[in-house]
């Protein structure tokens, strides 16, 4: 077998500034893993004919390389009829340079990686993809098909330079993971709720340079979670980024989102709960640009789309929204600032600063606050935390609201009844910024 064009990676995990608590990423490089052992799925029965099931071959290759090695899926089209549970890996990498097409109909997760450490999944060509063909389910009104990718209890990991398309359910979930990095990804799903882009909970995880198209979560933090850094995110006709839904015993702290561009989505950022208990604190949401979104800054502690949970409410504190600009779809119907907190668990130490947004329809917009205390706009600055409700109506556009757009903004969604094309991964995910890390394809061809 010819030598693999493996991306040269640092031998040590990466340490970046921000809300992270330490280093992230694999402990050893793909080069060192390949030098230990290489397991090509073609040697285990895979055939790039878009017919033969790759599931068993991938499982066997994992078993052979899970104690240290690199699993290679060469360029070509592969059918996946049976799902894989890849468990117990130590110093293992998977290079996906081909395209996997869902043909099976089981629920669960097409690809589950669990109880593993020092793990990496990526494409040398930055074109490796999984096509879920979710529209086959969605056109029948079925949102209970499989997820594409789930990492569960995985530490010191990276997932990058791959494309996930049209999941029957969620696209990518990180469940109780730690010390990981996710970047240089394109996720493209159907125009329906329940088709989440990225959901993450765990500790010390960096998500950056990701584009998401769908109609539900773009990149969303769930609980429990701490020290999560999310930056350079392109929600391109999506549901938008969020936190939640939050329920009982919520424990989320040290979260930073920055450089998030949101176009034609449900919201720029939403913190959503209904009852429940626990806390969210020490969170910064800065450098947000929005255009054409239904909601902008949306904190809703009485979110009616979830069933109420027992408890006085999730306590939100020390949360800052900074440097937001752009336009919302209709500022009178859905104002750009909505901070509705629980009367029995008021929000405290909330800050809204450098916030300039204006309506695309009409000539007025509203700011609404309820039981929310802090500094800025309709927030009450008081030592008292008695319940209150206030709505401010503004008829003059704020200065500085105009913002740069992205050339790749979609002009329509992809619906739910037809196959969704596989996109390419962009090199910019926020106006004026290039990706923090170059695409793997650029590194391997340099």
UniProtKB/Swiss-Prot annotation:
Glycans are attached at residues 50, 115, 124, 236, 281, 318. It is found in: Secreted. InterPro entries: Glyco_hydro_28, Pectin_lyas_fold, Pectin_lyase_fold/virulence, RHGA/B-epi-like_pectate_lyase. Its EC number is 3.2.1.171. The active site is at 216 (proton donor). Optimum pH is 3.6. Its main location: secreted. It comes from the Eukaryota. Residues 1-18 form the signal peptide. One of its GO terms (biological process) is cell wall organization. The keyword Isomerase does not apply. One of its GO terms (molecular function) is rhamnogalacturonan alpha-L-rhamnopyranosyl-(1->4)-alpha-D-galactopyranosyluronide lyase activity. It holds the Pfam family Glyco_hydro_28. Keywords: Carbohydrate metabolism, Cell wall biogenesis/degradation, Disulfide bond, Glycoprotein, Glycosidase, Hydrolase, Polysaccharide degradation, Secreted, Signal. It catalyses: Endohydrolysis of alpha-D-GalA-(1->2)-alpha-L-Rha glycosidic bond in the rhamnogalacturonan I backbone with initial inversion of anomeric configuration releasing oligosaccharides with beta-D-GalA at the reducing end. GO terms for cellular component: extracellular region. Disulfide bonds join 39-65, 218-235, 341-347, 369-378. Belongs to the glycosyl hydrolase 28 family. Pectinolytic enzymes consist of four classes of enzymes: pectine lyase, polygalacturonase, pectin methylesterase and rhamnogalacturonase. Hydrolyzes alpha-D-galacturonopyranosyl-(1,2)-alpha-L-rhamnopyranosyl linkages in the backbone of the hairy regions of pectins. This is Rhamnogalacturonase A. It comes from Aspergillus niger.
């Amino acid at each position: 077998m010819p030598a693999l064009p493996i991306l040269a990676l640092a031998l040590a995990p990466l340490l970046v500034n921000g809300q992270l608590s330490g280093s992230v990423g694999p402990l050893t490089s793909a080069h060192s893993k390949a030098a230990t052992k290489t397991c090509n799925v073609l040697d285990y029965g895979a055939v790039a004919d878009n017919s033969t099931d790759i599931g068993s071959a991938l499982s066997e290759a994992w078993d052979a390389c899970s104690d240290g090695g690199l699993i290679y899926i060469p360029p070509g089209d592969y059918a996946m009829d049976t799902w894989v549970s890849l468990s117990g890996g130590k110093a293992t990498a998977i290079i996906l340079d081909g395209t996997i097409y869902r043909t099976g109909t089981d629920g669960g997760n097409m690809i589950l990686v669990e109880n593993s450490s020092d793990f990496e999944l990526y494409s040398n060509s930055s074109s490796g993809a999984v096509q879920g063909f979710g529209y086959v389910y969605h056109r029948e009104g079925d949102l209970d098909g499989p997820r594409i990718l789930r990492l569960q209890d995985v530490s010191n990991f990276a997932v990058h330079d791959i494309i996930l398309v049209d999941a029957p359910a969620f696209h990518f979930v990180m469940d109780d993971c730690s010390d990981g990095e996710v970047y240089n990804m394109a996720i493209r799903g159907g125009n329906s709720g329940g088709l989440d882009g990225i959901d993450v909970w765990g500790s010390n995880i960096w998500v950056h340079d990701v584009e998401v198209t769908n109609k539900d979560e773009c990149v969303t933090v769930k609980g429990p979670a701490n020290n999560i850094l999310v930056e350079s995110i392109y929600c391109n006709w999506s549901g938008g980024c969020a936190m939640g839904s939050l329920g009982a015993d919520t424990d989320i702290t040290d979260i930073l989102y920055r450089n998030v561009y949101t176009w034609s989505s449900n919201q720029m950022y939403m913190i959503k709960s209904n009852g429940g208990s626990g806390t969210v604190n020490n969170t910064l949401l800065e450098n947000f640009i929005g255009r054409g979104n239904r909601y902008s800054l949306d904190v809703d502690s009485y979110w009616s789309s979830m069933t109420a949970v027992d408890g006085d409410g999730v306590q939100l504190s020390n949360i800052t929204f900074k440097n937001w600009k752009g336009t919302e779809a209709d500022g009178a119907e859905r104002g750009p600032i909505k901070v509705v907190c629980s009367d029995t668990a008021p929000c405290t130490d909330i800050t809204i600063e450098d916030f300039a947004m204006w309506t695309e329809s009409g000539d007025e917009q509203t700011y609404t606050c309820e039981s929310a205390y802090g500094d800025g706009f309709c927030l009450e600055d008081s030592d008292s935390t008695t319940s209150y409700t206030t709505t401010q109506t503004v008829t003059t556009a704020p200065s500085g609201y105009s913002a740069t757009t992205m050339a790749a903004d979609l002009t329509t969604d992809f619906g739910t009844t037809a196959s969704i094309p596989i996109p390419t991964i962009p090199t910019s995910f926020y106006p004026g910024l290039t990706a923090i890390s170059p695409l793997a394809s650029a590194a391997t061809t340099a």
